[in-house]
């Protein structure tokens, strides 16, 4: 690990307590029903290119509707709640319902890389960032969620590549994994500390 890298909040007991409570919350979600897991997947679909706070607001408003609303009704609900990508994301969510029954096995599988690849290949609107986000939110902390906040932070210390391909994402992720190994923290947990440093909050 580069000795110049500093994450002050790693030693802040209040922040550590907040983050590790969130970690336990994620682990609990991972043991939930397939319906709860799907709604968590929807959260990650909706957060892409918007924000976690916007996606959380959609979850609170629409709730179980993500499981059963028709495409048109879901589109209307997203639009009424001022979600920007209501057309394409409603389509993604409805088309992705066929994976609901697979989610418990994917989350329980010891092959985390395989689970992530399966999500990327089989869920509409899910790339490596979103799949990593989902797996982190259900208690799998192996992966880096390389959003704009994390990429900005990494770019202070290392030359990073744009996440425009699988190859580039995995290249950047390997850098992040090496950093996390240096701190002795799993990538998906270190991500929370950096996100807190960059934004002053932890949502999910």
UniProtKB/Swiss-Prot annotation:
The keyword Nucleotide-binding does not apply. Catalyzes the excision of an oxidatively damaged form of guanine (7,8-dihydro-8-oxoguanine = 8-oxoG) from DNA. Also cleaves the DNA backbone at apurinic/apyrimidinic sites (AP sites). It comes from Thermoplasma acidophilum (strain ATCC 25905 / DSM 1728 / JCM 9062 / NBRC 15155 / AMRC-C165). The record marks 204 as: Important for guanine/8-oxoguanine distinction. Signal peptide: none annotated. One of its GO terms (molecular function) is hydrolase activity, hydrolyzing N-glycosyl compounds. This is 8-oxoguanine DNA glycosylase/AP lyase. SUPFAM superfamilies: DNA-glycosylase.
């Amino acid at each position: 690990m580069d000795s110049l890298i500093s994450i002050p909040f790693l030693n802040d007991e209040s922040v550590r307590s907040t983050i590790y409570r969130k970690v336990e919350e994620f682990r609990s979600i991972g043991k939930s029903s397939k319906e709860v897991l799907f709604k968590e997947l929807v959260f990650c679909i909706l957060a892409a290119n918007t924000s976690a706070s916007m996606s959380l607001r959609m979850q609170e408003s629409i709730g179980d509707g993500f499981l059963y609303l028709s495409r048109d009704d879901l589109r209307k609900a997203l639009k009424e709640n001022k979600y920007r990508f209501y057309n394409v994301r409603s389509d993604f969510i409805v088309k992705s319902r066929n994976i609901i029954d697979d989610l418990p096995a994917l989350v329980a599988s010891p092959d985390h890389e395989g689970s992530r690849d399966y999500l990327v290949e089989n869920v509409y609107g899910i790339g490596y960032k979103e799949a990593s986000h989902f797996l982190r939110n259900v208690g799998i902390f192996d992966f880096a969620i390389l959003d704009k906040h994390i990429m900005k932070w990494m770019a202070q210390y290392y030359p990073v590549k744009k996440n425009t391909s699988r190859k580039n994402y995995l290249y950047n992720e390997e850098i992040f994994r090496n950093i996390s190994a240096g701190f002795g923290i799993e990538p998906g947990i270190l991500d929370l500390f950096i996100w807190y440093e960059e934004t002053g909050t932890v949502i999910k």
